[in-house]
């Protein structure tokens, strides 16, 4: 059985971290996880599922002692593959894996945006360090064509990039009225109150401020924000200034994303820049109407695959009008659009497992240049 060590920067409830936890349940290989920082609540969940989680104890970006500690773990484990996730883990993990003599090193690039990577500016130094360590790996997985294009712009050779999008477990998000009622009771939301939902890290680029403004212009509508991050205080202050602090619920990070989505009536994703748009797909899997500004996961799909997912500009007036309209319309939450099935997690896990095999793009995984040509024809 192929033995794989996944190396990730941390295990908070972010999109990349949740995606790893999901893949661990579907990958047909033996997996362990190493987190550079603390394991946290998500790490505890992964351990309860039977997957070992190792904490490297990294104390900051300048903690160079983390590198030999990680290399020792990899050497002792004698893994067939090291698979890294997120910038810091990709840099440290590739170096440590090569120090330990691991035969195959894969990296997934989840969060490479335009001008930033995981919230840090993509300075010349950041790009140079990434390129230098990327060459130590066997292949880099891009979760969307947008990420692949940015990797190429950074100087990563196209033949080293494989596109494998994120996966969704549709069954986990199937609408459950009892779960909706229980989540609303726990959050102090009335069963009949209309709820606009936002899902993701509370950072300025997510533009949740547009949702606060929109809710302030609508009577009796609640805003449920699911996630944590540095913009929370600014959003809470904005809600107070707009006189709607009593109608905005900050739920924080949660392991029960399905329950949070069940409690919503519409998912609003006004982020101006996304590398994939996992939350949008999860909202669709939950039977929600979804309004978004950026979602690479939907960009290349036929319009009929996600009929109730619509793009809106970054304008509070447009969001107010559209959300008010959507909330007036009845919905059948049991209907899930075809777009969700296109990203079935079992298929994504099978693609990764093929990539773990020895040899260039083993088992039929395609270099991004081939898929880009297919998309253009």
What are these model-derived regions, one by one?
Residues 301-317, 325-330:
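Conserved acidic donor-binding segment of nucleotide-sugar-dependent glycosyltransferases
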Residues 6-65, 150, 230:
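N-terminal strand-loop element at the rim of the active site
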Residues 64-68, 103-106, 113-136, 149:
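Nucleotide-sugar donor phosphate/pyrophosphate-binding loop at the beta->alpha transition
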């Amino acid at each position: 059985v192929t033995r794989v060590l996944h190396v990730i920067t941390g295990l908070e409830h972010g999109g990349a971290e949740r995606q790893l936890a999901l893949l661990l349940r579907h990958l047909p290989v033996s997996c362990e996880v190493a987190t550079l920082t603390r394991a946290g609540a998500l790490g505890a969940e992964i351990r309860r599922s039977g997957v070992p989680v190792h904490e490297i104890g990294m104390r900051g970006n300048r903690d160079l002692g983390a590198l030999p500690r990680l290399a020792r773990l990899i050497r002792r484990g004698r893994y067939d593959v090291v698979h890294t996730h997120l910038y810091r883990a990709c840099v440290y993990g590739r170096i440590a894996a090569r120090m330990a003599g691991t035969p195959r090193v894969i990296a997934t690039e989840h969060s490479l945006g335009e001008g930033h990577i995981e919230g840090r500016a993509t300075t010349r130094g950041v790009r140079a360090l990434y390129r230098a360590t990327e060459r130590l790996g066997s292949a880099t997985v891009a979760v969307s064509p947008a990420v692949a294009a940015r990797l190429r712009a950074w100087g990563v050779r196209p033949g080293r990039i494989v596109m494998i999008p994120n996966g969704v477990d549709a069954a986990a998000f199937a609408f459950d009225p009892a779960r909706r009622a229980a989540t609303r009771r726990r959050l102090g939301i009335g069963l009949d109150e209309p709820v606009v939902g936002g899902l993701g890290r509370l950072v300025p680029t997510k533009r949740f401020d547009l949702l606060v403004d929109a809710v302030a212009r609508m009577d009796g509508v609640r805003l449920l924000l699911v996630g944590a991050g540095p913009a929370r205080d600014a959003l809470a202050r904005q809600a107070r200034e707009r006189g709607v602090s009593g109608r905005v619920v900050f739920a924080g990070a949660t392991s029960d994303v399905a329950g949070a989505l069940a409690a919503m009536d519409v998912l609003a994703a006004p982020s101006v820049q996304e590398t994939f748009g996992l939350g949008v797909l999860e909202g669709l899997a939950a039977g929600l109407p979804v309004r978004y500004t950026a979602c690479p996961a939907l960009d290349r799909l036929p319009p009929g695959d996600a009929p109730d997912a619509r793009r809106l500009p970054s304008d509070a007036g447009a969001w107010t009008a559209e959300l008010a309209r959507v909330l007036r319309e009845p919905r059948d939450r049991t209907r899930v659009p075809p777009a969700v099935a296109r990203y079935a997690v079992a298929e994504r896990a099978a693609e990764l497992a093929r990539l773990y095999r020895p040899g260039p793009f083993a088992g039929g995984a395609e270099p991004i240049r081939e898929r880009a040509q297919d998309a253009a024809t």
